[in-house]
């Protein structure tokens, strides 16, 4: 068994799939799929109704993984159509029946892995800084549209347009005398109304359409992982779907009735986006969130560089800008917080994996001022809860909200209550990150950036933060003393601040 082999099981509301992957070559050695789950009713009911079939498939996947002698395997599930409680129950039933532990992926994570997959395309490395690229992906519950400048991530927009809406549209148009394409077009146009009003970059643009080989999208299926098609060719496809009878479409594009019903809205959607974006090129690719998961595992094991951490931080900065935050105070708090964290990490007192979460909290802790200065930390948590950070898991989102709520020094007695709902192991991690951010915020309490530099030393169960400033720090000292108790409690040492007069 090669250590570079990886078993990836992915469960969606359509079927379960196993991929045996060579992480070094990033190629699929073998792929197995369950029978497609019976659709009908609400999509979230599919998991429950098809549990016996899903269980049988997973047991078969375990046997195949054992045949390869693979120890490194993971099970992921698409949670977009499940609430958290139902997902927890289903995960427990799967574990009892198969021994497999499933990691559910929320919509923000799935969007993140789709972006990674798009960035890994060979064509992506050819993009120049004067070119903009839109990455379009249809998901089980959301449509994701991501914008890049050159090879750099800029932003992602999410639209509530998934299979359920598409199937409802299909049912609605079956018995109407009006042209179904016109009705579908009006519905999709309504979904895109906000995007139409957003100021979009001018200049050369292309559009990449992901996962075109998925269920119900055979008419756009490429023979390779990615290919460029002429926009006139797509215009011909759109014309067919607008003018031709269903029987002709099913024969020409090899579609069944259900696939055709799902395909029509997809074609209309792409056509509307082409009109808005006006790309000079269209690329079709089979890449999907599954591709992104493979790439992530390859990066984790150092088979390829991890080039994607900037996506999460860029998305964070976008939220900060939207709510008129992210200025000098936010940048300085972030700088000080990461410096303190790194010294504590060197001493083995924090988990290095939490560094990114601390940076996100540092950049977003003041966005609640957009709503109201009073209780602005509560407002910050509310805003973040309503704007899921791309790439963060449900657990990481819960931790982030708790860290933000912890910053209210006027309500220090509420500390324990803010994270009591978390798992015990997470409570300590949250308290540590919240304590670090409090200390960092204290050092710019006046919002005047009086301190230019800090040096953190840890010795004999004491932490000394030496700050460089030639200005009066009375306010900073006072706020520091108000905040230091939590840090001393969670790190088990005395913490002091010392001023060094700078030039």
Predicted regions span which residues?
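Gly/Thr-rich phosphate-binding beta-strand-loop-beta motif of the actin/hexokinase/Hsp70
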Residues: 1-29, 122-159, 211
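Post-signal peptide N-terminal segment of secreted/secretory-pathway proteins
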Residues: 71-73, 85
């Amino acid at each position: 068994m090669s250590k570079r082999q990886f078993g990836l099981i992915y469960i969606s509301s359509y079927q379960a799939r196993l991929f045996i992957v060579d992480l070094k070559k990033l190629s699929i050695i073998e792929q197995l799929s369950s029978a497609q789950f019976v659709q009908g009713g609400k999509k979230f009911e599919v998991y429950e109704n098809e549990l016996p079939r899903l269980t049988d498939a997973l047991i078969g996947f375990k046997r195949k993984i054992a045949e390869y002698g693979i120890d490194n395997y993971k099970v992921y599930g698409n949670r977009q159509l499940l609430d958290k409680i139902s997902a927890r129950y289903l995960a427990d039933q799967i574990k009892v029946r198969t021994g497999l532990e499933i990691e559910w992926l929320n919509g923000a994570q799935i969007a993140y892995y789709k972006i990674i997959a798009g960035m890994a395309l060979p064509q992506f490395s050819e993009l120049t800084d004067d070119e903009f690229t839109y990455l379009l992906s249809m998901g089980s519950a959301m449509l994701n549209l991501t914008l890049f400048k050159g090879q750099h991530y800029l932003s992602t927009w999410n639209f509530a347009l998934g299979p359920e809406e598409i199937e409802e549209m299909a049912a609605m148009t079956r018995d109407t005398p009006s042209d179904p394409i016109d009705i579908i077009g009006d519905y999709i146009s309504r979904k895109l109304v906000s995007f139409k009003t957003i100021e979009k970059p001018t200049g050369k643009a292309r559009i990449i359409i992901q996962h075109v080989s998925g269920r119900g999208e055979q008419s756009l299926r490429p023979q390779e992982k990615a290919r460029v098609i002429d926009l006139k060719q797509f215009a011909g496809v759109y014309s067919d779907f607008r003018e031709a009878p269903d029987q002709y479409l099913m024969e020409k594009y090899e579609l069944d009735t259900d696939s055709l019903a799902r395909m029509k809205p997809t074609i209309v959607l792409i056509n509307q986006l082409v009109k808005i974006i006006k790309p000079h090129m269209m690329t079709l690719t089979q890449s999907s969130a599954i591709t992104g998961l493979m790439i992530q595992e390859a990066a984790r094991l150092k088979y390829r560089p991890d080039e994607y951490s900037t996506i999460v931080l860029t998305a964070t900065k976008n939220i900060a800008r939207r709510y008129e935050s992210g200025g000098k105070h936010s940048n300085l708090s972030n700088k000080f917080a990461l410096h303190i964290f790194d010294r504590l990490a060197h001493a083995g007192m924090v988990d290095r994996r939490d560094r990114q979460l601390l940076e996100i909290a540092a950049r977003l802790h003041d966005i609640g001022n957009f709503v109201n200065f009073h209780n602005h930390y509560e407002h910050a948590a509310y805003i973040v809860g309503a704007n899921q950070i791309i790439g963060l898991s449900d657990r990481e989102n819960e931790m982030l909200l708790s860290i933000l709520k912890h910053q209210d020094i006027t309500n220090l007695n509420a500390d324990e209550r803010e994270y009591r709902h978390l798992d015990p192991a997470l409570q300590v991690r949250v308290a540590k990150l919240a304590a670090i951010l409090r200390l960092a915020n204290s050092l710019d309490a006046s919002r005047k950036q009086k301190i230019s530099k800090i040096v953190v030393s840890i010795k004999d169960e004491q932490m000394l933060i030496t700050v460089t400033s030639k200005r009066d720090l009375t306010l900073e000292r006072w706020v520091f003393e108000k905040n230091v108790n939590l840090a001393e409690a969670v790190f088990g040492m005395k913490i002091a601040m010392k001023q060094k007069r700078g030039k």
